[in-house]
Amino acid sequence: MIARVPFDEGSLTGTLTLDSKWPKEDWRSTYFVPENLRLSVEHADALKPLIPANSTMAEMALRFILNNPDVSTIIPGMRKIRNVEANTAASDKGPLPGELHAELRKHRWERKPTKWSQ
């Protein structure tokens, strides 16, 4: 199985805020309309206290996916060399501890189609 969009269009990088803005030609300017941005930030913020020491939310997201034995590869975004290096390092660390994985599963978010997503 190939896991795609592991950072939930960027919300699981931990860098989005309610003030995040993008250039008009950037697809995120229409994807992260206020309603979606608010929900995405709220869900990501709820995960921040769970980030392991010396880790990042992006690393935690990748390692969470690695807990699934059916996943053979993950396709994360890599706009910069540092992203490639960080993603590779996350993979080298392997899956998250079972206790943390179980805690993260409690944060599952089922996105329902809404007006902005049609």
Question: What function would you assign to each model-found segment?
Answer:
Residues 46, 50-53, 99, 103, ...:
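Generic non-transmembrane alpha-helical segments
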Residues 2, 9-22:
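Short acidic/glycine-rich loop or secondary-structure boundary segments that cap or lie
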